[in-house]
Amino acid sequence: MKHECREGVRGLRFSRRYFLKQGGIAMVGLSAMPAFLQRAVAATPMPNKKQLVVLFQRGAADGLNIVVPFGEPSYYRMRPSIAIPEPRRGGGDAAVDLDGFFGIHPSLAPLEPLFQKNQLAIVHAAGSPDPTRSHFDAQDFMESGTPGVKSTEDGWLNRAIETTPEENASPFRAVAMGPNLPRMLRGAAPAIALPDVRQFKVMAQSPIVEGGFEAMYAQTVDRALRGTGTETFEAIDMLRKADPGKYQPENGAQYPNGPLGRNLQQVGQLIKADIGVEVLFVDCGGWDNHVNEGGVQGQLSNLLRDLGQTLAAFHQDMGDRMENLVVVTMSEFGRTAHENGNRGTDHGHANCMFVMGGPVKGGHVYGKWPGLESHQLNEGRDLALTTDFRSVLGEILENHIGVKELKAVFPGFDNNPRKFPGLIRA
Protein backbone atom coordinates (compact mmCIF):
# COMPACT_ATOMS: atom_id res chain seq x y z
CA MET A 1 0.00 0.00 0.00
CA LYS A 2 1.50 3.34 -1.02
CA HIS A 3 0.41 5.32 2.01
CA GLU A 4 1.53 2.76 4.58
CA CYS A 5 5.03 3.06 6.02
CA ARG A 6 6.76 -0.04 7.24
CA GLU A 7 9.22 1.91 9.40
CA GLY A 8 8.42 4.46 12.07
CA VAL A 9 10.62 7.27 10.73
CA ARG A 10 9.16 6.91 7.26
CA GLY A 11 5.73 7.06 8.84
CA LEU A 12 6.62 10.44 10.32
CA ARG A 13 7.92 11.64 6.98
CA PHE A 14 4.55 10.78 5.52
CA SER A 15 2.90 12.88 8.21
CA ARG A 16 5.11 15.87 7.41
CA ARG A 17 4.36 15.57 3.69
CA TYR A 18 0.67 15.24 4.43
CA PHE A 19 0.57 18.35 6.61
CA LEU A 20 2.68 20.34 4.16
CA LYS A 21 0.28 19.44 1.39
CA GLN A 22 -2.97 19.78 3.29
CA GLY A 23 -2.43 22.45 5.90
CA GLY A 24 0.79 24.42 5.56
CA ILE A 25 2.74 23.05 8.53
CA ALA A 26 6.55 23.09 8.31
CA MET A 27 8.43 20.64 10.53
CA VAL A 28 12.12 19.82 10.24
CA GLY A 29 13.57 16.72 11.88
CA LEU A 30 12.31 14.77 14.86
CA SER A 31 12.77 17.71 17.21
CA ALA A 32 9.62 19.27 15.77
CA MET A 33 7.49 16.22 16.45
CA PRO A 34 5.43 15.73 19.63
CA ALA A 35 7.11 13.56 22.24
CA PHE A 36 4.64 10.70 21.85
CA LEU A 37 5.43 10.48 18.13
CA GLN A 38 9.17 10.60 18.80
CA ARG A 39 8.79 7.63 21.15
CA ALA A 40 6.76 5.83 18.52
CA VAL A 41 9.77 6.06 16.22
CA ALA A 42 12.03 4.51 18.84
CA ALA A 43 9.53 1.78 19.68
CA THR A 44 9.01 -1.39 17.68
CA PRO A 45 7.18 -0.41 14.48
CA MET A 46 3.55 -1.46 14.12
CA PRO A 47 2.95 -1.75 10.38
CA ASN A 48 -0.57 -1.79 9.00
CA LYS A 49 -2.19 -0.43 12.15
CA LYS A 50 -5.86 -1.39 12.22
CA GLN A 51 -8.55 1.19 12.82
CA LEU A 52 -12.26 1.05 13.65
CA VAL A 53 -14.98 3.66 13.22
CA VAL A 54 -18.28 3.10 15.07
CA LEU A 55 -21.30 5.06 13.81
CA PHE A 56 -24.33 5.07 16.11
CA GLN A 57 -27.72 5.78 14.51
CA ARG A 58 -29.38 7.24 17.57
CA GLY A 59 -33.16 7.08 17.71
CA ALA A 60 -33.79 3.53 16.41
CA ALA A 61 -33.42 3.34 12.64
CA ASP A 62 -36.00 1.47 10.56
CA GLY A 63 -33.97 -1.49 9.36
CA LEU A 64 -36.84 -2.90 7.30
CA ASN A 65 -36.89 0.18 5.07
CA ILE A 66 -33.10 0.52 5.06
CA VAL A 67 -32.41 -3.04 3.91
CA VAL A 68 -35.68 -4.00 2.27
CA PRO A 69 -36.82 -7.66 2.23
CA PHE A 70 -38.64 -7.18 -1.07
CA GLY A 71 -38.77 -10.95 -1.51
CA GLU A 72 -41.00 -11.19 1.57
CA PRO A 73 -44.69 -10.76 0.56
CA SER A 74 -45.72 -9.86 4.11
CA TYR A 75 -43.53 -6.76 3.98
CA TYR A 76 -45.85 -5.04 1.51
CA ARG A 77 -49.02 -6.03 3.36
CA MET A 78 -47.63 -4.58 6.59
CA ARG A 79 -46.53 -1.26 5.12
CA PRO A 80 -49.11 -0.15 2.55
CA SER A 81 -48.01 3.51 2.46
CA ILE A 82 -44.30 3.45 3.38
CA ALA A 83 -42.97 0.22 1.79
CA ILE A 84 -40.13 0.57 -0.70
CA PRO A 85 -41.15 -0.81 -4.12
CA GLU A 86 -39.49 -3.91 -5.54
CA PRO A 87 -36.48 -3.33 -7.79
CA ARG A 88 -37.20 -2.70 -11.42
CA ARG A 89 -35.11 -1.62 -14.36
CA GLY A 90 -34.49 2.04 -15.04
CA GLY A 91 -36.19 3.35 -11.93
CA GLY A 92 -34.68 5.30 -9.06
CA ASP A 93 -37.80 5.02 -6.95
CA ALA A 94 -37.39 1.38 -5.91
CA ALA A 95 -35.13 -0.76 -3.78
CA VAL A 96 -31.64 -1.36 -5.17
CA ASP A 97 -31.38 -5.12 -5.62
CA LEU A 98 -28.55 -6.80 -3.69
CA ASP A 99 -29.20 -10.52 -3.97
CA GLY A 100 -32.69 -11.15 -5.32
CA PHE A 101 -34.32 -11.00 -1.88
CA PHE A 102 -32.86 -7.96 -0.14
CA GLY A 103 -32.38 -4.48 -1.52
CA ILE A 104 -31.19 -1.21 -0.04
CA HIS A 105 -33.29 1.95 0.05
CA PRO A 106 -32.76 3.95 -3.17
CA SER A 107 -31.29 6.82 -1.15
CA LEU A 108 -28.43 4.44 -0.26
CA ALA A 109 -27.61 3.83 -3.93
CA PRO A 110 -24.05 5.25 -3.52
CA LEU A 111 -23.27 2.22 -1.34
CA GLU A 112 -24.32 -0.37 -3.93
CA PRO A 113 -20.95 -0.30 -5.78
CA LEU A 114 -19.17 -0.98 -2.48
CA PHE A 115 -21.43 -3.98 -1.88
CA GLN A 116 -20.67 -5.30 -5.37
CA LYS A 117 -16.92 -4.80 -4.80
CA ASN A 118 -17.15 -6.83 -1.58
CA GLN A 119 -16.28 -3.78 0.53
CA LEU A 120 -19.66 -3.66 2.28
CA ALA A 121 -21.52 -6.34 4.22
CA ILE A 122 -24.90 -6.18 5.94
CA VAL A 123 -26.13 -8.12 8.96
CA HIS A 124 -29.94 -8.25 9.14
CA ALA A 125 -32.13 -9.20 12.11
CA ALA A 126 -29.30 -8.10 14.41
CA GLY A 127 -29.29 -6.20 17.67
CA SER A 128 -29.64 -6.52 21.42
CA PRO A 129 -31.58 -9.44 22.93
CA ASP A 130 -32.98 -7.23 25.69
CA PRO A 131 -36.73 -6.62 25.16
CA THR A 132 -36.75 -2.97 26.25
CA ARG A 133 -38.40 -0.39 24.03
CA SER A 134 -36.87 2.52 25.94
CA HIS A 135 -34.39 4.57 23.92
CA PHE A 136 -32.40 5.41 27.03
CA ASP A 137 -32.09 1.83 28.30
CA ALA A 138 -31.50 0.31 24.87
CA GLN A 139 -28.77 2.80 24.00
CA ASP A 140 -27.18 2.22 27.38
CA PHE A 141 -27.14 -1.55 26.82
CA MET A 142 -25.75 -1.25 23.29
CA GLU A 143 -22.98 1.06 24.49
CA SER A 144 -22.13 -0.80 27.69
CA GLY A 145 -22.17 -4.11 25.84
CA THR A 146 -24.13 -5.73 28.67
CA PRO A 147 -27.82 -5.94 27.66
CA GLY A 148 -30.15 -6.03 30.65
CA VAL A 149 -27.45 -4.97 33.12
CA LYS A 150 -27.76 -1.36 34.26
CA SER A 151 -24.88 -1.45 36.75
CA THR A 152 -22.09 -1.60 34.15
CA GLU A 153 -20.03 1.57 34.49
CA ASP A 154 -17.80 1.45 31.43
CA GLY A 155 -18.38 0.97 27.71
CA TRP A 156 -17.47 -1.98 25.51
CA LEU A 157 -15.21 0.06 23.22
CA ASN A 158 -13.27 1.42 26.19
CA ARG A 159 -12.83 -2.10 27.55
CA ALA A 160 -11.59 -3.24 24.15
CA ILE A 161 -8.88 -0.58 24.27
CA GLU A 162 -8.04 -1.44 27.86
CA THR A 163 -7.48 -5.11 26.99
CA THR A 164 -4.99 -4.17 24.24
CA PRO A 165 -2.62 -1.73 25.98
CA GLU A 166 0.15 0.00 24.03
CA GLU A 167 3.37 1.14 25.70
CA ASN A 168 3.63 4.27 23.58
CA ALA A 169 -0.06 4.87 22.96
CA SER A 170 -1.10 8.17 21.48
CA PRO A 171 -3.45 10.41 23.50
CA PHE A 172 -5.60 10.26 20.36
CA ARG A 173 -5.89 6.46 20.40
CA ALA A 174 -9.64 6.63 21.15
CA VAL A 175 -11.59 9.64 19.90
CA ALA A 176 -15.28 10.57 19.83
CA MET A 177 -16.35 13.26 17.40
CA GLY A 178 -18.62 15.50 19.44
CA PRO A 179 -18.87 17.61 22.60
CA ASN A 180 -19.39 14.67 24.97
CA LEU A 181 -17.66 11.37 25.51
CA PRO A 182 -20.22 8.67 24.65
CA ARG A 183 -21.13 5.87 27.04
CA MET A 184 -19.29 3.46 24.76
CA LEU A 185 -15.90 5.12 25.37
CA ARG A 186 -16.21 5.80 29.09
CA GLY A 187 -13.95 3.78 31.35
CA ALA A 188 -10.40 3.30 32.55
CA ALA A 189 -8.69 3.59 29.16
CA PRO A 190 -7.87 7.15 28.01
CA ALA A 191 -10.37 8.55 25.51
CA ILE A 192 -11.23 12.05 24.39
CA ALA A 193 -14.16 13.87 22.82
CA LEU A 194 -13.31 16.28 20.02
CA PRO A 195 -16.21 18.58 19.08
CA ASP A 196 -14.48 20.02 16.03
CA VAL A 197 -10.95 19.54 14.77
CA ARG A 198 -11.02 23.15 13.58
CA GLN A 199 -11.83 24.48 17.06
CA PHE A 200 -9.17 22.43 18.87
CA LYS A 201 -11.31 21.81 21.92
CA VAL A 202 -10.91 18.51 23.70
CA MET A 203 -13.55 17.47 26.20
CA ALA A 204 -13.00 15.01 29.04
CA GLN A 205 -15.28 12.56 30.83
CA SER A 206 -15.99 14.86 33.77
CA PRO A 207 -18.53 17.72 33.56
CA ILE A 208 -16.23 19.62 35.93
CA VAL A 209 -13.94 20.34 33.03
CA GLU A 210 -16.43 21.43 30.38
CA GLY A 211 -14.38 24.55 29.70
CA GLY A 212 -12.04 22.65 27.42
CA PHE A 213 -8.88 20.66 27.72
CA GLU A 214 -6.67 23.46 29.03
CA ALA A 215 -8.96 23.94 32.01
CA MET A 216 -9.15 20.21 32.50
CA TYR A 217 -5.39 19.83 32.51
CA ALA A 218 -5.00 22.67 34.99
CA GLN A 219 -7.42 20.93 37.37
CA THR A 220 -6.00 17.42 36.73
CA VAL A 221 -9.17 15.69 37.90
CA ASP A 222 -9.93 13.35 35.01
CA ARG A 223 -8.44 9.89 35.32
CA ALA A 224 -8.76 9.10 31.62
CA LEU A 225 -6.31 11.83 30.64
CA ARG A 226 -4.21 12.08 33.81
CA GLY A 227 -0.56 11.63 32.90
CA THR A 228 -1.09 12.30 29.21
CA GLY A 229 -1.99 15.99 29.40
CA THR A 230 1.27 17.35 28.07
CA GLU A 231 1.25 14.96 25.14
CA THR A 232 -2.32 15.84 24.29
CA PHE A 233 -1.36 19.52 24.26
CA GLU A 234 1.42 18.64 21.82
CA ALA A 235 -0.96 16.68 19.62
CA ILE A 236 -3.51 19.51 19.65
CA ASP A 237 -0.77 21.98 18.75
CA MET A 238 0.27 19.70 15.90
CA LEU A 239 -3.29 19.69 14.55
CA ARG A 240 -3.58 23.45 15.01
CA LYS A 241 -0.45 24.05 12.94
CA ALA A 242 -1.79 21.72 10.29
CA ASP A 243 -4.69 24.16 9.76
CA PRO A 244 -7.41 21.52 9.27
CA GLY A 245 -9.73 24.15 7.82
CA LYS A 246 -7.76 23.83 4.59
CA TYR A 247 -8.25 20.08 4.37
CA GLN A 248 -9.02 18.75 0.90
CA PRO A 249 -10.48 15.22 0.58
CA GLU A 250 -8.60 12.92 -1.76
CA ASN A 251 -9.63 10.97 -4.85
CA GLY A 252 -12.35 13.46 -5.75
CA ALA A 253 -14.43 12.67 -2.66
CA GLN A 254 -17.16 15.16 -1.76
CA TYR A 255 -18.71 14.97 1.69
CA PRO A 256 -22.27 16.24 2.26
CA ASN A 257 -22.41 19.60 4.01
CA GLY A 258 -24.04 18.44 7.23
CA PRO A 259 -23.05 17.29 10.72
CA LEU A 260 -22.45 13.69 9.68
CA GLY A 261 -20.47 14.66 6.60
CA ARG A 262 -18.33 17.09 8.58
CA ASN A 263 -17.70 14.53 11.32
CA LEU A 264 -16.66 11.76 8.93
CA GLN A 265 -14.45 14.17 7.03
CA GLN A 266 -12.71 15.08 10.27
CA VAL A 267 -12.38 11.39 11.12
CA GLY A 268 -10.56 11.09 7.82
CA GLN A 269 -8.30 14.01 8.76
CA LEU A 270 -7.36 12.38 12.05
CA ILE A 271 -6.63 9.04 10.40
CA LYS A 272 -4.45 10.63 7.73
CA ALA A 273 -2.58 12.71 10.32
CA ASP A 274 -0.86 9.56 11.63
CA ILE A 275 -1.16 10.58 15.28
CA GLY A 276 -2.00 7.11 16.57
CA VAL A 277 -5.79 7.04 16.17
CA GLU A 278 -7.17 3.52 16.53
CA VAL A 279 -10.89 3.75 17.36
CA LEU A 280 -13.29 6.57 16.56
CA PHE A 281 -16.94 7.16 17.42
CA VAL A 282 -19.48 9.22 15.49
CA ASP A 283 -23.08 9.95 16.49
CA CYS A 284 -25.84 10.28 13.92
CA GLY A 285 -29.27 11.22 15.30
CA GLY A 286 -32.82 11.75 14.08
CA TRP A 287 -33.95 8.18 13.37
CA ASP A 288 -37.06 8.08 15.60
CA ASN A 289 -39.71 8.40 12.89
CA HIS A 290 -43.10 7.81 14.52
CA VAL A 291 -44.93 10.21 12.18
CA ASN A 292 -44.66 10.61 8.40
CA GLU A 293 -41.56 8.47 8.04
CA GLY A 294 -42.03 8.31 4.32
CA GLY A 295 -41.06 5.65 1.83
CA VAL A 296 -38.93 6.42 -1.21
CA GLN A 297 -39.19 10.10 -0.24
CA GLY A 298 -39.53 11.66 3.20
CA GLN A 299 -37.78 11.87 6.53
CA LEU A 300 -36.08 8.49 6.43
CA SER A 301 -35.05 8.98 2.82
CA ASN A 302 -33.34 12.26 3.69
CA LEU A 303 -31.41 10.65 6.53
CA LEU A 304 -30.36 7.75 4.34
CA ARG A 305 -29.27 10.01 1.50
CA ASP A 306 -26.96 11.81 3.91
CA LEU A 307 -25.70 8.53 5.36
CA GLY A 308 -25.10 6.88 1.99
CA GLN A 309 -23.33 9.86 0.45
CA THR A 310 -21.20 10.34 3.56
CA LEU A 311 -20.07 6.72 3.83
CA ALA A 312 -19.33 6.57 0.11
CA ALA A 313 -17.34 9.82 0.30
CA PHE A 314 -15.40 8.56 3.31
CA HIS A 315 -14.54 5.31 1.51
CA GLN A 316 -13.40 7.27 -1.55
CA ASP A 317 -11.40 9.76 0.53
CA MET A 318 -9.59 7.02 2.45
CA GLY A 319 -8.55 5.18 -0.71
CA ASP A 320 -6.01 2.44 0.05
CA ARG A 321 -6.28 3.22 3.76
CA MET A 322 -9.56 1.30 3.76
CA GLU A 323 -7.48 -1.89 3.65
CA ASN A 324 -6.80 -1.42 7.37
CA LEU A 325 -10.08 0.24 8.31
CA VAL A 326 -13.52 -1.03 9.29
CA VAL A 327 -16.66 1.08 9.74
CA VAL A 328 -19.64 -0.43 11.58
CA THR A 329 -23.10 1.05 12.09
CA MET A 330 -25.49 0.26 14.94
CA SER A 331 -28.76 1.52 16.42
CA GLU A 332 -30.47 0.81 19.74
CA PHE A 333 -33.32 -1.24 18.23
CA GLY A 334 -35.40 -1.46 15.08
CA ARG A 335 -38.97 -0.44 14.30
CA THR A 336 -42.28 -2.28 14.20
CA ALA A 337 -42.93 -4.46 11.18
CA HIS A 338 -46.34 -2.84 10.66
CA GLU A 339 -46.57 0.86 9.93
CA ASN A 340 -48.63 2.78 12.47
CA GLY A 341 -51.65 5.03 11.99
CA ASN A 342 -49.45 8.08 11.43
CA ARG A 343 -47.57 6.63 8.45
CA GLY A 344 -44.59 5.99 10.64
CA THR A 345 -43.26 3.14 12.73
CA ASP A 346 -42.89 2.56 16.46
CA HIS A 347 -40.21 1.05 18.67
CA GLY A 348 -39.36 -2.47 17.61
CA HIS A 349 -36.66 -5.06 18.18
CA ALA A 350 -34.13 -6.39 15.62
CA ASN A 351 -32.43 -4.15 13.09
CA CYS A 352 -29.64 -4.16 10.49
CA MET A 353 -25.94 -3.33 10.79
CA PHE A 354 -23.58 -2.20 8.03
CA VAL A 355 -19.91 -3.23 8.06
CA MET A 356 -17.64 -1.49 5.52
CA GLY A 357 -13.94 -1.76 4.76
CA GLY A 358 -11.11 -3.66 3.13
CA PRO A 359 -11.00 -6.44 5.76
CA VAL A 360 -14.73 -7.11 5.24
CA LYS A 361 -16.05 -10.12 3.35
CA GLY A 362 -18.62 -7.96 1.65
CA GLY A 363 -21.20 -8.51 -1.03
CA HIS A 364 -23.40 -10.56 1.28
CA VAL A 365 -26.33 -10.05 3.66
CA TYR A 366 -25.43 -12.04 6.77
CA GLY A 367 -27.70 -13.46 9.43
CA LYS A 368 -30.60 -15.90 9.48
CA TRP A 369 -33.74 -14.25 8.15
CA PRO A 370 -36.60 -14.94 10.61
CA GLY A 371 -39.46 -14.00 8.32
CA LEU A 372 -42.30 -11.52 8.71
CA GLU A 373 -45.34 -13.76 9.05
CA SER A 374 -47.34 -13.09 12.22
CA HIS A 375 -46.08 -16.20 14.01
CA GLN A 376 -42.47 -15.30 13.14
CA LEU A 377 -42.53 -11.82 14.64
CA ASN A 378 -41.15 -10.89 18.04
CA GLU A 379 -44.12 -10.38 20.38
CA GLY A 380 -46.31 -10.46 17.28
CA ARG A 381 -45.11 -7.05 16.08
CA ASP A 382 -41.34 -6.79 15.45
CA LEU A 383 -38.60 -8.33 13.35
CA ALA A 384 -37.19 -11.14 15.49
CA LEU A 385 -33.54 -11.19 16.54
CA THR A 386 -31.26 -13.88 15.09
CA THR A 387 -27.80 -12.26 15.47
CA ASP A 388 -26.60 -10.69 18.71
CA PHE A 389 -24.79 -7.40 18.04
CA ARG A 390 -21.96 -8.61 20.27
CA SER A 391 -21.17 -11.39 17.81
CA VAL A 392 -20.70 -8.83 15.05
CA LEU A 393 -18.61 -6.51 17.21
CA GLY A 394 -16.70 -9.41 18.74
CA GLU A 395 -15.61 -10.64 15.33
CA ILE A 396 -14.49 -7.15 14.32
CA LEU A 397 -12.55 -6.68 17.55
CA GLU A 398 -10.85 -10.08 17.46
CA ASN A 399 -10.15 -10.52 13.76
CA HIS A 400 -9.50 -6.87 12.89
CA ILE A 401 -8.31 -4.94 15.96
CA GLY A 402 -6.64 -7.95 17.57
CA VAL A 403 -8.57 -8.09 20.85
CA LYS A 404 -8.17 -11.52 22.44
CA GLU A 405 -9.99 -11.01 25.75
CA LEU A 406 -13.55 -10.80 24.47
CA LYS A 407 -14.85 -12.09 27.80
CA ALA A 408 -13.59 -8.88 29.37
CA VAL A 409 -15.13 -6.76 26.61
CA PHE A 410 -18.53 -8.49 26.65
CA PRO A 411 -18.83 -10.13 30.09
CA GLY A 412 -21.42 -12.85 30.40
CA PHE A 413 -21.68 -13.41 26.65
CA ASP A 414 -20.42 -16.52 24.88
CA ASN A 415 -18.45 -14.92 22.05
CA ASN A 416 -17.17 -18.16 20.58
CA PRO A 417 -15.38 -17.48 17.27
CA ARG A 418 -17.26 -20.42 15.77
CA LYS A 419 -20.43 -18.37 16.21
CA PHE A 420 -19.07 -15.29 14.44
CA PRO A 421 -21.04 -14.28 11.32
CA GLY A 422 -17.86 -14.73 9.26
CA LEU A 423 -17.73 -11.24 7.79
CA ILE A 424 -14.12 -10.26 8.65
CA ARG A 425 -11.04 -11.75 7.04
CA ALA A 426 -8.96 -13.24 9.84
Task: Report each predicted region and the residues it spans.
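Conserved active-site-proximal phosphate/metal-binding subdomains
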Residues: 347-348
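Feature for exported/extracytoplasmic and membrane-associated proteins, marking the mature portion
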Residues: 2-320, 338, 352-359, 364-426
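Acidic/histidine-rich, metal-coordinating catalytic segments
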Residues: 326-334
